[in-house]
Design a protein with these regions (language model features):
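Catalytic donor/gating beta->alpha subdomain of glycosyltransferases that bind UDP-sugars
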Residues: 159-192, 218-221, 226-288, 383-385
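Acidic donor-binding segment of Leloir-type glycosyltransferases
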Residues: 67-117
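Short aromatic/hydrophobic "clamp" motif used to bind/position activated sugar donors
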Residues: 126, 138
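N-terminal membrane-anchoring/stem segments of glycan-assembly enzymes
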Residues: 1-46, 185, 194-196, 331
Length: 390
């Protein structure tokens, strides 16, 4: 009884969309498989001086260990680390001062960045720290990022190519301690990095990934420094885009940094994902609109429902089962490749759950401009800049 399914126009369209989503998922997996993930760079004879800038605000139980990993860098070249806070009474200051005292051989200092301007406080701190940085390479990193001792050495290696001005790397959610975070880990540890690599099969990388970015100071100054980004939500995206527009190349390091987070519930994770969705929609409205086509569980599920209405239940269930099963297998393989010891952090059933929820987030990205970010209500303008909503 396949004939009614084949001739019904809507079923034909849905079958085509389900097939297209499977092809896009497979393409995404193949692009990721070709990337030399976790490979170390052998660049001991290339050790340019580096300034590490770390904007901070508040702390949790993971902060000290994450910051300590930066003091453990085994880099043969000159390097320094500058920590920036807006308030000298911030609870993170005690951690930083303690780490500086415990590691006297590391050139490190805490900078209180007062009277900051701009909607993006993190970038405002970076702009202040940039003025104090001593070296020609600037490495910026979020507070929750944890790295291996050879991280700086691996990041500088792509800069042997003089035309390369910016190096970034992938990041993974390292400690999804709640079901909500395990759900989010599917988006980060399976989908995000593989989608970035999928995009590079069509055109060179022209945006940056925010967890850790290394940039030549000269290229940064060409775009006006961090001061030109203080009102941007997606400051990492804009940093990479503007440097690429100035004719420089961007590179991906094969290292993966870890992002450690405190436990979060569904409400907190949903707000984060909605902010992320609206950010991507503003940055790349066209590609984001068509990204719904790559939802590997949504279209097969809709096809199964449509097949039920046309009397082809078994065909619909079989087609949906094969497509969603492939999506689960490939997503779990991507998570294993991305994680040390090939360890899974998300159970298989969260893969289709993530896809179905992603469809709602996709719609929500187009239905509003407000976000909640760092405890503040903000509105995102069409150009990606922020406006206080309260």
């Amino acid at each position: 009884m396949l004939f009614p399914l084949v001739v019904h126009p809507w079923n034909l369209i849905l079958a085509g969309l389900a097939g297209l989503s499977c092809c896009l998922v497979l393409w995404q997996w193949l692009a990721a498989r070709r990337f030399p993930l976790h490979q170390k760079a052998n660049a001991r004879d290339f050790t340019p001086a580096v300034s590490v800038l770390k904007p901070l605000k508040g702390c949790d139980e993971t902060t000290e260990t994450s910051l300590r990993s930066w003091f453990a860098q085994q880099y043969a070249g000159n390097w320094e680390i500058l920590f920036g806070v807006a308030d000298g009474q911030d609870t993170v200051c005690d951690i930083v001062r303690r780490l500086i005292t415990q590691n006297p051989s590391v050139s490190a200092r805490l900078v209180v960045c007062e009277n900051l301007t701009g909607a993006n406080a993190k970038v405002a701190k970076l702009a202040r720290l940039q003025q104090l940085a001593a070296h020609g390479l600037i490495l910026i990193s979020d507070a929750d990022v944890r790295v291996t001792p050879d991280f700086i050495g691996n990041m500088v290696a792509p800069l042997r190519a003089e035309q390369t001005a910016l190096v970034n790397c992938f990041y993974r959610l390292a400690n999804p301690t709640t079901t909500a975070l395990q759900w989010e880990a599917v988006a980060i540890n399976a989908d995000f990095w593989s989608q970035v690599l999928q995009s590079t099969t069509l055109k060179p990388l022209n945006f940056a990934l925010g967890a850790a970015i290394l940039v030549r100071r000269q290229a940064l100054e060409e775009i006006g420094g961090f001061a030109s980004l203080v009102d941007c939500l997606a400051d990492d995206y804009q940093l990479g885009r503007q440097i690429a527009e100035h004719g420089h190349n961007l590179a991906l390091c094969s290292q993966v940094v870890e992002c450690w987070d405190s436990p979060k519930d569904w409400r907190q994770v949903w707000k984060h994902q909605l902010r992320w969705a609206r950010t991507i929609r503003v940055c790349q409205p066209g590609p984001y609109f068509f990204s719904i086509l790559s939802n590997g569980s949504l279209w097969p599920a809709i096809l199964a429902v449509a097949a039920l209405g046309s009397g082809n239940l078994w065909f619909g269930l079989l087609a949906a089962g094969l497509c969603i099963g492939m999506r689960i297998l490939l997503a779990q393989d991507l998570q294993r490749r991305f994680t040390p010891n090939r360890r899974l952090v998300s159970p298989f059933w969260l893969v289709p759950t993530k896809d179905f929820a992603q469809a709602i987030l996709w719609l929500g990205a187009f239905l509003g401009t407000s976000i909640e970010w760092r405890g503040r209500r903000m509105k995102v303008r069409r150009d990606g800049t922020l406006l206080a909503a309260d």
